[in-house]
Regions:
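Residue(s) in the substrate-gating loop at a strand-loop-helix junction
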Residues: 138
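Active-site helix of classical SDR
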Residues: 120, 154, 162
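Substrate-binding pocket helix/loop in short-chain dehydrogenase/reductase
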Residues: 96-97, 101-109, 201, 205
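Conserved glycine-rich cofactor-binding loop
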Residues: 9, 16-17
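Short, small/polar-rich loop/turn modules that mediate ligand/substrate recognition or access, typified
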Residues: 86, 170, 175, 235-237
Length: 249
């Protein structure tokens, strides 16, 4: 049994499905006690059952500050501290430039940017020396991607958050890094297109990856667990791509 993270307290936002769920499972497998958030209770309950007997699910929307207050109040009461924060909750839509609405823009930036900022800010009183913050970025933050400009811009903001927050937190011994997945086969990826077009999307994306395939959520989870661990103790303000080389060539 891997006990790298034994005794650590972790929070994974957006932890009920996809990358968040796989990461929560990996953190728990390495010994951490894991709290997850999600917006849908049924998915949250199912995820907790898949993670560990000690896992805790809290229904919350990270774009709502009152929800975040409730999350951290519970962790403070039950644990008194937080060692690992994976600010993962987010999402986006395929939106051509001429079709983007104010509502869509506000929703995507509300979760991916505003939500990440306040997820981290409100965690600060619980984070102590040696804590690790990991943000979910994306390869699209450094590439032009048709019909994906709002999501891409939101993830570029997340990348800069890590750079800036590493400076804001210097002296506290808290590391801030970004894990940036490429095409990972998750429900969220499939939901970008109608069901009849999903395999075509998967094939087109895999063709752009030097390794010739899509990634698995668990592969991102292992990268997050590494960044959360003492093995990454001198890694700060960096971006770790888990993309099979897609954004690097």
């Amino acid at each position: 049994m891997n006990t790298t993270l034994s005794g650590k307290i972790a929070l994974v936002t957006g932890g009920s499905t996809g990358i968040g769920l796989a990461t929560a499972q990996e953190l728990a497998a390495q010994g951490a006690k894991v709290y997850i958030t999600g917006r849908r209770q049924a998915e949250l309950d199912a995820a907790v059952a898949k993670i560990a007997s000690t896992a805790v699910g809290i229904r919350a929307d990270v774009s709502k500050l009152a929800d975040l207050d409730e999350v951290y109040a519970r962790i403070a009461k039950e644990e008194g501290r937080l060692d690992i924060l994976f600010a993962n909750a987010g999402g986006g839509d395929m939106l051509p430039l001429g079709a983007i609405t104010e509502e869509q823009f506000d929703r995507i930036f509300g979760t991916n940017v505003r939500g990440v900022l306040f997820t981290v800010q409100k965690a600060l009183p619980l984070l102590s020396t040696g804590s690790s913050i990991i943000l979910t970025g994306s390869t699209v933050s450094i590439k032009g991607t048709a019909n994906f400009s709002v999501y891409s811009a939101s993830k570029a903001a997340v990348r800069n958050f890590a750079r800036s927050w590493a400076l804001d937190l210097q002296g506290r011994g808290i590391r801030v890094n970004v894990v940036s997945p490429g095409p990972i086969k998750t429900p969220g990826l499939g939901d970008l297109v109608p069901e009849e077009h999903r395999q075509g999307l998967y094939d087109a994306l895999a063709a752009q990856v030097p390794l010739g395939r899509l990634g698995a959520p668990g592969e991102v989870g292992k990268a997050v667990a590494f960044l959360a661990s003492d093995a990454a103790s001198f890694i700060n303000a960096t971006e770790l791509f888990v993309d099979g080389g897609m954004a690097q060539i």
